From Swiss-Prot:
Superkingdom assignment: Eukaryota
Name of this chain's protein: ASTRA-associated protein 1
Quaternary state and interactors: Component of the ASTRA chromatin remodeling machinery complex.
Xref: InterPro entries: WD40/YVTN_repeat-like_dom_sf (IPR015943), WD40_repeat_CS (IPR019775), WD40_repeat_dom_sf (IPR036322), WD40_rpt (IPR001680)
Gene name of the record: asa1
Keyword presence, Translocase: no
Record's compositionally biased regions (Polar residues): 280-290, 333-352
Length: 469
């Protein structure tokens, strides 16, 4: 008889807390103020600010007259909300301001006049398509009174185009028009790569693309080139998120696919790398390029194209991939012919179209995709009521969080790495802990800031709060 103990099956995960308070389905969630607060928004336009040290509401108000599409923090004292009432609002919400705001939750039948925080800016924008905003901060100091930011939203008149607004001026800086055949913009992210403004977009027809400024600039005005386009999804894109390193982005859709896409570096970065490697500029992603690189011009037209050598375990570089495609597509053409790049689209040889990885999860309808700040995992909210956690590296499913009985619409991760401004606070907390002077309140605050939170909002109006990995 064997004396070895049988393995104990893993226990299913349980939420750390359930936040009950919304009467309508929860559509948006975001951690703000160094993870001390969780902000959630529902289909009635209500916003609830939860204090994670006590798991209680600290501020409740109706921010919009229609469905709330998105929520985001801007520094530690400002909150941005976006509703289907065609308004995007920037609120001033400091910790001291919470004392003057209502605590009565939307689910409470008691009628109460809920005051609103101070309204700083309001943009009249389009909400024809359920796509929320993207914030690109421009100021190095997120707490400066003179801070600047850009807001990207779908265009007011043309739902496939993208408007970029400037704050605090509230002026429309630029409109990006990337084509007329993709349908409505469903999800977008605006960010910068090596000083170049870049946008990742998911469309109604399942297309995901990356467009980038042709020239480095401090404003988004100018020519934008499509650098990557893929139609790997068969249904509308529901959500996307960009990695902190700006080297890839992930998309989810109404189909069952999760897709990892590349973010090409700026064309000038590719040129610089080519020169450092001894490659001629004609073979790189230049604005005016040879249809066939000089290095390949001496090859007979019918000779096979040899793929550039790849380092084991390392994907082919963007430059090598572009050269291989260029040689294969133009082998029969004259090596001396030159092609001028159009003003709105790049040469075909520079347009990437292959995703990094495509995974069929067998679970249709995953939305609210978010990548955690450490870049290790991402999560989705499922129409089947499940919250799924995946590895960013392998795209493998790591966990399925089951608690809600109806569909989930939103997920949010707390920030793992504390901002530089909180390092001194952490040092003081550590010193106090060693001295035995930590109060219960300080312990709660410390835990709220350091916990690896995952919040999920559901159709039932409840928010589940999980502590994972």
């Amino acid at each position: 008889m064997s004396t070895s103990a049988a393995p104990v099956p893993a226990q299913p995960a349980h939420p750390r807390s359930i936040l009950r308070g919304h009467k309508a389905q929860v559509h948006a969630a975001a951690f703000v103020r160094n993870n001390e607060r969780l902000v959630t928004g529902d289909a009635d336009g209500f916003v609830v600010v939860w204090d994670l040290t006590i798991m209680r509401p600290r501020a409740v108000w109706r921010a919009h007259d229609d469905v709330l599409l998105g929520i985001g923090g801007w520094g530690t004292d400002r909150l941005i909300t976006h509703g289907r009432d065609n308004k995007l609002i920037v609120w001033q919400l400091r910790e001291a301001d919470e004392d003057s705001l209502a605590k009565t939750l939307p689910v409470d039948p008691a009628a109460e006049d809920r005051p609103k925080p101070w309204l700083l800016y309001m943009l009249e924008i389009s909400t024809m398509n359920f796509c929320t905003f993207s914030l690109c901060e421009m100021s190095s100091d997120p707490l400066s009174e003179d801070r600047e930011a850009l807001i990207a939203v779908p265009n007011t008149l043309s739902s496939e185009a993208i408007d970029i607004f400037h704050l605090p001026s509230q002026k429309r800086e630029h409109t990006i028009r990337l084509g007329q055949s993709e349908g409505m913009v469903m999800a977008l992210e605006l960010f910068r790569v090596d000083g170049y403004f870049t946008v990742a977009v998911g469309y109604e027809n399942g297309v995901a693309l990356v467009a980038q400024q042709a020239e480095r600039s401090e404003t988004p005005v100018g020519t934008w080139n499509v650098r990557y386009r893929s139609k790997a999804h068969t249904q509308p894109v529901l959500s996307l998120d960009v990695s902190l390193g700006r080297d890839f982005f992930l998309t989810s859709s109404a189909d069952s696919l999760l897709i990892k896409h590349p973010i090409p570096p700026p064309q000038t970065s590719v040129l610089k790398t080519a020169r450092e490697d001894g490659t001629t500029s004609e073979g790189a992603n230049a604005s005016v390029i040879d249809s066939q690189p000089p290095a390949l011009a001496s090859r007979p037209p019918d000779a096979p194209v040899a793929a550039p050598p790849a380092t084991p375990g390392k994907p082919m570089s963007l430059l090598s991939a572009a050269l291989a495609r260029e040689a294969a597509g133009d082998s029969a053409e004259s090596p001396t012919r030159r092609t001028t790049q159009p003003s709105d689209t790049p040469p075909e040889s520079t347009l990437l179209s292959e995703p990094v990885k495509v995974v069929n999860t067998k679970h249709a309808g995953q939305q609210g995709l978010r990548i955690r700040s450490d870049g290790r995992i991402f999560a989705t909210a499922g129409w089947d009521s499940r919250v799924r956690v995946y590895s960013c590296k392998t795209m493998k499913e790591l966990a399925v969080l089951k608690w809600h009985q109806v569909g989930c619409f939103a997920v949010a991760f707390s920030t793992i790495d504390a901002p530089a401004g909180t390092q001194a606070e952490g040092a003081r907390d550590g010193l106090a802990a060693r001295m035995g002077d930590v109060t219960v309140k300080e312990k709660r605050i410390s835990h709220a800031k350091s916990a690896h939170w995952l919040a999920a909002g559901s159709k039932d109006g409840k928010v589940s709060l999980w502590e994972i990995y």
